[in-house]
């Protein structure tokens, strides 16, 4: 086997590989031994007919596919080793049919790590909203908690209001005659939910438990039951029970019930602390997003389509998992959105391209700045993974195998982005509350 590197262009290595006639014959013999077991030739037991007769009856091409599966992978791997080429994605082959007694040539286009040319990416100016936590953010969080832990209280003497839940009996009549589907008992109705036809719920406001009322309504012209559409109706409604929710009072008792704190002031401080942590996380993510966008514009990163395709497939798999959590398959999603896999792949292609180029840019930056990930840092990260998955450290290391080096690369990329963020000139140009950011 001989291999020749013809050129490297746009992060793809073009190589020509030649396999000797002896290796071709070895591949054809391998294919013959495999194929002959699967066919029956009159006059011979299965697997015993000579190769010449097999080729005569089915044609020489009957052996080509299996012969290529034997010849090409081994020759390709040896060529990569000989030429010291490290592929980053699957190659594309240009292959002709092999001929017995003749050397066999084929070409491979191999995606390789791009030669990244970094521009002036230190000190990039980025503009982000102001994520400062304000007092109204804390107040809103408290209000959300008051509603979350609101108590359900029965109204005995007070009249019903919008938002209350009523237990009612009702029966509807048109021209004095009851109609099918117009009766219900012990029906739970939240006023303002628009569960009933327009005008029904509003007429129950002000009623007390134990009271009754004739509710006059008109069915919409577009009502699903055609025999009722556009007709006037009277519903005899009896209110049996009224419940309302009362927001909790903000005091020490509330703090003790909903948190580990003894006083409302301690809870307030913790709420502000959590909001500030979330705001800082969003601030950093906002800086990172704009910073990466601008940094990539300053760099030359030729990435082969095959590598971007791999990222598209990873994104598709992630999306498919998210859909599965919602009880949908990817095919169902495509049906609902009148789309298909190809359209979706094209839609996410720009995002995939930015992601791939961003990683290569940050890897190059880490290399130029001499950034390394120590064994201690790597082990600390693996320990966190083990804790998250409830596994022993040794077990998760065994499961990860060679993927541990991918983790090391990821940590190095994290260091590079932190470096860029530290060097960036950040201008906060607009205000946005932490609650709105959430």
Curated annotation (Swiss-Prot):
It catalyses: [protein]-peptidylproline (omega=180) = [protein]-peptidylproline (omega=0). Residues 163-248 form the PPIase FKBP-type domain. Keywords: Cell cycle, Cell division, Chaperone, Cytoplasm, Isomerase, Rotamase. It comes from the Bacteria. InterPro entries: PPIase_dom_sf, PPIase_FKBP_dom, Trig_fac, Trigger_fac_C, Trigger_fac_C_sf, Trigger_fac_ribosome-bd_bac, Trigger_fac_ribosome-bd_sf, Trigger_fact/SurA_dom_sf. SUPFAM superfamilies: FKBP-like (SSF54534), Triger factor/SurA peptide-binding domain-like (SSF109998), Trigger factor ribosome-binding domain (SSF102735). Involved in protein export. Acts as a chaperone by maintaining the newly synthesized protein in an open conformation. Functions as a peptidyl-prolyl cis-trans isomerase. Consists of 3 domains; the N-terminus binds the ribosome, the middle domain has PPIase activity, while the C-terminus has intrinsic chaperone activity on its own. This is Trigger factor.
């Amino acid at each position: 086997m001989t291999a020749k590197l013809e050129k490297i262009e746009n992060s793809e290595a073009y190589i020509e590989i030649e396999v000797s006639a002896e290796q071709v014959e070895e591949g054809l013999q391998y294919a013959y031994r495999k194929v002959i077991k699967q066919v029956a030739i009159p006059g011979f037991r299965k697997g015993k007919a000579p190769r010449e007769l097999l080729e005569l009856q089915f044609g020489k091409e009957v052996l080509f596919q299996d012969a290529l599966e034997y010849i090409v992978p081994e020759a390709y791997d040896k060529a990569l080793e000989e030429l010291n080429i490290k592929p980053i994605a699957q190659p594309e082959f240009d292959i002709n049919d092999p001929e017995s007694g003749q050397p066999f040539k084929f070409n491979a286009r191999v995606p390789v790590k791009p030669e990244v040319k970094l521009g002036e990416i230190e000190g990039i100016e980025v503009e982000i909203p102001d994520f400062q936590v304000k007092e109204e953010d804390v107040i809103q969080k408290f209000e959300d908690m008051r509603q979350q832990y609101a108590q359900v209280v029965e109204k005995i003497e007070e009249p019903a209001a919008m938002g209350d839940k009523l237990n009612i009996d009702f029966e509807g009549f048109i021209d004095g005659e009851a109609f099918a589907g117009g009766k219900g008992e012990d029906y739970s109705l939240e006023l303002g939910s628009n569960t009933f036809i327009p005008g029904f719920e509003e007429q129950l406001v002000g009623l007390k438990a134990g009271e009754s009322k004739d509710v006059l309504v008109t069915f919409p012209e577009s009502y699903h039951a055609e025999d009722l559409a556009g007709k006037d109706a009277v519903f005899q409604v009896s209110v049996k029970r009224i419940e309302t929710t009362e927001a909790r009072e903000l005091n020490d008792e509330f703090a003790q019930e909903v948190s580990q704190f003894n006083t409302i002031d301690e809870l307030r401080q913790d709420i502000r602390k959590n909001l500030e942590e979330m705001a800082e996380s969003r601030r950093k993510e906002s800086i990172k997003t704009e910073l990466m966008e601008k940094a990539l514009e300053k760099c030359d990163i030729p990435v082969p389509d095959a590598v971007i395709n791999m990222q598209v497939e990873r994104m598709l798999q992630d999306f498919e998992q998210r859909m599965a959590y919602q009880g949908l398959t990817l095919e169902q999603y495509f049906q609902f959105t009148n789309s298909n896999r190809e359209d979706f792949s094209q839609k996410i292609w720009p995002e995939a391209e930015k992601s791939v180029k961003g990683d290569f840019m940050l890897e190059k930056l880490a290399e130029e700045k001499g950034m390394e990930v120590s064994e201690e840092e790597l082990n600390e990260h693996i320990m966190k993974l083990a804790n998250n998955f409830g596994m022993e450290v040794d077990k998760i290391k065994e499961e990860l195998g060679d993927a541990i080096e991918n983790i090391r690369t990821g940590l190095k990329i994290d260091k590079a982005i932190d470096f860029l963020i530290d060097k960036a000139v950040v201008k906060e140009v607009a205000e946005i509350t932490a609650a709105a950011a959430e």
